[in-house]
Design a protein with these regions (language model features):
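Transmembrane alpha-helical segments that form core, pore/gating elements
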Residues: 40, 52, 62-66, 122-124, ...
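Hydrophobic/small/kink-forming positions within alpha-helical transmembrane segments
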Residues: 33-36, 40, 67, 89, ...
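Hydrophobic transmembrane alpha-helices of multi-pass small-molecule transport proteins
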Residues: 2-6, 66, 88, 92, ...
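Membrane-interface helix-cap regions at the ends of transmembrane helices
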Residues: 37, 41-44, 48, 61-78, ...
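C-terminal transmembrane-helix exit sites in multi-pass transporters
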Residues: 65-75, 118-140, 262-282
């Protein structure tokens, strides 16, 4: 997370008022569009290729893409950084496994919006782990998103299992985000992310081997999804995100990231044929409203968690 370099009340004109920030904002929105279209590709791919094998190859490609630029930096992480990156990488693998298993059982649009609930769940995870204070906006986001989830899952009974799996994935992503705040200020971002993706690859590979699911991917449906998710959505998506976030504020970044469920719904409707009906789209709208309401609260909670942990470390280990 970045420090908010301008107030959240800057207004709509502030989003585009700084010409230097416009390319960064456009880049972030492009990344969210790529993330959105991958839901359609992954759903098609895992229909014909085993889930854990697909995810293992995806993270193998992502790790290989980042290996060269990150190789010289990994040593600088030390044992603590490598161990932390490996642990968070395994959490990442668990999140993707749950999300993809849910995607197999529900619609693309539902998966995108429910995944976005990680924003709503992040303050709750911080409350459980660090007793962080969360305001009314965060609780309002929880209420809206929960109501939206109930509406979305009420479309047809067959989607409930898939929706709950995706919700579990969102909870894992929230846990990873909160724990990441322990490491983000201390370690090189590129090297740390490489370790995360490599650990995710190893974990998913072991599961695929244990299940006997590993095989050579065949056909453009599978390979196209692997290349887009492995190279563009994961590796290059991270690099663009890192470049853009250094050139814009946390407020603009939050605005861009909130577009991911919207892109997912767009591609789900146009490419996957999602037809959710009034109740389903109403649920999506409620979840989106909850995300937008909770986003600033989630960012503030994480900033406060980092500040409090830095303060406690400073008191227990004074400078020499």
């Amino acid at each position: 997370m970045l420090d908010d370099r301008e107030g959240a009340s800057a207004g709509a004109f502030a989003v585009f008022g700084d010409n230097r920030a416009v390319p960064a904002l456009v880049a972030l929105i492009f990344v969210t569009a790529v993330w959105g279209v991958t839901f359609v590709q992954v759903k098609d791919a895992v229909a014909i290729y085993p889930l854990f094998a697909f995810l293992a190859v995806r993270f193998a490609i992502a790790s290989a893409t980042l290996a060269f630029p990150a190789a010289k930096r990994v040593r600088g992480l030390g044992r603590g950084g490598v161990a932390g990156g490996a642990f968070l990488g395994l959490l990442l693998a668990a999140g993707y496994a749950l999300q993809t298993a849910g995607l197999e059982r529900t619609t693309v649009s539902s998966t995108g919006f429910i995944t976005g609930m990680y924003v709503v769940l992040t303050p709750l995870i911080a409350l459980l782990l660090y007793r962080a204070r969360i305001g009314l906006a965060a609780w309002g986001g929880v209420v809206l998103a929960t109501a939206g989830l109930a509406m979305l899952s009420g479309i047809h009974a067959g989607s409930v299992t898939g929706d709950l799996l995706v919700l579990a994935a969102a909870a894992v992503y929230s846990l990873q985000i909160v724990l990441m705040e322990r490491y983000a200020p201390r370690f090189d971002a590129l090297a740390f992310t490489f370790v995360e993706m490599a650990a995710a690859f190893v974990g998913l590979l072991l599961v695929a081997l244990a299940l006997g699911d590993l095989g050579v991917p065949r056909g453009w449906t599978v390979w196209g999804a692997l290349l887009v998710t492995g190279v563009f959505a994961s590796a290059l998506g991270f690099l663009v995100q890192t470049w853009a976030q250094r050139r814009t504020s946390a407020t603009r970044t939050a605005l861009a990231f909130s577009m991911e469920p919207v892109w997912t719904a767009f591609f789900g409707y146009t490419l996957a044929g999602d037809r959710l009906g009034a109740l389903g789209w109403g649920g999506c709208a409620a979840i989106m409203a909850g995300i937008v309401l909770a986003e600033p609260a989630a960012a503030a909670v994480l900033v406060n968690v980092v500040a409090s942990r830095r303060g406690s470390r400073g008191r227990s280990r004074p400078r020499r």
